[in-house]
Amino acid sequence: MLFRSNIHTLPNGLRIIHAPNQSAVAYCGFAVDAGTRDEADNEQGMAHFVEHLLFKGTKKRHAWHILNRMEHVGGDLNAYTNKEETIVYSAFLAEHFPRAVELLSDIVFHSTFPQHEIDKEVEVIIDEIQSYEDSPSELIFDDFEELLFPNHPLGRNILGKPDLLHQFKSEDALRFTSRYYRPENMIFFVQGNVDFKRVVRLVEKSTADLTSNIGTYTRKHPDIYIPQNLTLHRDTHQAHVMIGSRGYDAHNEKRTALYLLNNILGGPGMNSRLNVSLRERSGLVYNVEANLTSYTDTGVFCIYFGTEHDDVDRCMRLVKKELKKLCDKPLSIAQLAAAKKQIIGQIGVARDNAESTALGMAKTFLHYNKMDDPQEVFQRIEALTSKELWEVSNEMFAENQLSTLIYL
């Protein structure tokens, strides 16, 4: 599985990463190094709000023209906001790359944020918030991060708060984008059958009016982690439970070991230890999963399950039993080999999703200015020892390090 990439930095500071392939479908877009954690206290929800408004009008296009520009050639225009980045991108037949790069440059750098569009979009996002709050199996993930990062932007809901959203004006969105939507604070990525020299030429042309303007913003680091246990009473037909702690940041060498342990415990395979214990053997849950998120300076490890109210304690005991097994005894040679083989296969299969691969490339290059070759990832996994996994287990899964959030 070969991975090739080309990298170039424009005079205005915009970095370009290009991953060529022979597919008829290409992906390209801008990734901005700004997300929910970069909002001021009075801007909660602004990163996501701006992402919505990028499609609502520029100096030369109305919203309808933006929506139809790629649709007319069968393409797709999309965006998402995360805690640490915002990505605006398009999927299209490779021959339409010039159209895509011109449109994306226009909406990312020249959006005007008309007030009448803001007033309409506020109601759309509030409806999104209400829909989200009706889904406890999703909402609990945000509430758990708030438990892990109290009084810190990483603990905030990406969607924001209705009372603040109603206060947002055009100048607020313009102020936010002028602070973060700068060429040196983002990257342009493209994956597909598009010539690299052509990519550089067209991106440079579309961003020729931009200049580098290095800011002084520094992200606030989280305070020292103190485990918390919280039970909230909600009117739901089943209980929802989160167990976990802060994890390793994306630079930490131990992250690969935790990644493998996370997969052993509650990865997507039906043979994960938690799925076998709680669902297959006990019939206590429909869904149980373990998740790992790495930020630039911290991370989150968590286990989620939903069960009948009367079965919460039993499920908790089974989860802690599986965690204790990993702490008490290193994996055998056979267990370690099987775990490595499974996760390497899963990564290989996941790379068959071109859109996911393009977005993953963008996120990695944005934050770390490099791109991992899959073979390098596989080598790091293969190099892991049982002793390393055992040490990480005892560091991460010790009961006195775990936080718990329960919806009853």
Task: Locate the predicted segments by residue.
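Short beta-strand-initiation
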Residues: 3, 11, 225-227, 273
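Short, well-ordered turn and helix-capping elements at secondary-structure junctions
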Residues: 14, 32-36, 74, 245-247, ...
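Short, conserved beta-strand segments within well-ordered enzyme catalytic domains
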Residues: 17, 27-31, 54, 78-80, ...
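His/Glu-based metal-binding/catalytic segments typifying zinc-dependent metallopeptidases
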Residues: 20-24, 29-31, 214-271
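Charge-rich, well-structured scaffold segments of protease-associated domains
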Residues: 2, 9, 66-215, 221, ...
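Non-catalytic terminal extensions that flank enzyme cores
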Residues: 1-15, 25
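Histidine-centered active-site/metal-ligand motif
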Residues: 48, 52, 152, 240
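Active/ligand-binding-proximal structured segments within catalytic/core domains
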Residues: 13, 20-70, 253-265, 273-278
